[in-house]
């Protein structure tokens, strides 16, 4: 999980 996606999840 990269920084952009981990914020969403």
Curated annotation (Swiss-Prot):
Q: Does the keyword Secreted apply?
A: yes
GO CC, sorted alphabetically, is:
extracellular region
Give a brief account of the tissues where this protein occurs: Expressed by the venom gland.
Keywords, A to Z, come to:
Secreted
UniProt keyword annotation of Secreted present: yes
**Where is this protein localized, as stated in its record?**
Secreted
Leader sequence range is none
Q: What protein name is recorded for this chain?
A: Venom peptide 2
Its lineage reads:
Eukaryota, Metazoa, Ecdysozoa, Arthropoda, Chelicerata
């Amino acid at each position: 999980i990269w920084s952009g996606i981990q914020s969403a999840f």
